[in-house]
Design a protein with these regions (language model features):
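Acyl-donor binding region in acyl/amide transferases
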Residues: 12-74, 186-244, 251
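Generic preference for flexible, low-structure residues
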Residues: 66-71, 98-100, 132, 148, ...
């Protein structure tokens, strides 16, 4: 069944959305396995009420192959879809990180002096969810990106009944300061819901919790892959064992409004890219980062 979703096409500077325009699109997401295989998806017929497609994690090598006659194409994002091969074993994976990364992670873990709590059953997730949900409400992921932990505890418990979710909390002095909640897609665990208390940002609680979660996953042996999903970031790049060059490709019906929208997005994104280059030349990255996050 083809699902049509309202998609907000955002005019963004860093994590800050300045404006957005909505289009009803058929979303075609590729899994990590499909991206790694270099797959080119077969698009479903476009319903009359839909204005186009949004294909996510399309291997960059398939970008031109997916062109559809008469449709307007626009790349919304280019990134590496990072992942970790969990068959490597913890020691081999950790040895594959840069020396600076290894030393930094060890130092952060010692400095933060916190406990890791682990959750996988339906009963355990009933304890995890309210604590993580309260923490999520304070994170920039939820406040600025709308990417917080969902309210749906029942959904998490259904996943737990199928042994298809893992979750962790980092707790310091009885207070949850970071959470990680990862549903599974077959043998792949997804980096889906993550956040930390802004008051502890200087201690890198998310990185510390991620390291301990990976230690658990390597030891458990239940999953073959850890998927950092769409988009990039220093944290993902630092910990990944590999990645696939991907694009998010939007295909729209060739209406006048859609032509104007694509031109506006291209012009705005080009201006942001130019501004970033100027900021780098001036050495003002720190100031720009604070402005983007507000």
């Amino acid at each position: 069944m083809t699902v049509i979703q309202p998609v907000a096409l955002r005019f963004m500077v860093g994590a800050r959305t300045l404006a957005s325009v909505r289009r009803r699109l058929v979303r075609v997401p590729l899994t990590l396995a499909e991206a790694r295989q270099g797959a080119c998806p077969e698009l479903p017929p476009l319903p009359q009420e839909a204005q186009g497609y949004l294909i996510t994690s399309l291997p960059e090598t398939q970008h031109t192959a997916l062109g559809r006659a008469g449709m307007l194409g626009a790349v919304r994002q280019r990134y590496t879809r990072f992942h970790i091969d969990l068959s490597l074993g913890f020691d081999a994976w950790f040895a594959g990180l840069s020396a600076n990364s290894r030393q930094g992670l060890k130092r952060k873990a010692r400095r933060i002096d916190a406990e890791v709590h682990r959750f996988r059953t339906a009963e355990e997730l009933a304890i995890f969810h309210p604590l993580a949900r309260a923490l999520s409400a304070r994170t920039y992921q939820e406040r600025l990106l709308g990417g917080g932990l969902p309210d749906d505890l029942a959904g998490l418990q259904r996943l737990a009944a199928a042994d298809a979710v893992r979750a962790w909390l980092l707790v310091r002095d009885g207070r949850a300061i970071a959470y990680l909640c990862c549903p599974a897609d077959g043998d792949t665990l997804l980096y889906a819901h993550v956040g930390h208390d802004p008051a502890f940002a200087a201690h890198s609680p998310g990185a510390v919790l991620q390291l301990e979660a990976l230690r658990d996953l390597f030891a458990e042996g239940r999953f073959a892959w850890f998927d950092f999903t769409e988009g990039e970031g220093q944290h993902k790049r630092q910990m990944a064992s590999g990645g696939v060059a991907c694009v998010d490709l939007m295909l729209l019906r060739p209406t006048l409004a859609n032509r104007a929208l694509i031109a506006a997005l291209a012009g705005f994104d080009g201006s942001v890219a130019l501004a970033k280059r100027v900021v780098r030349r001036l050495g003002a990255e720190g100031i720009a980062r604070r402005v983007r996050r507000g």
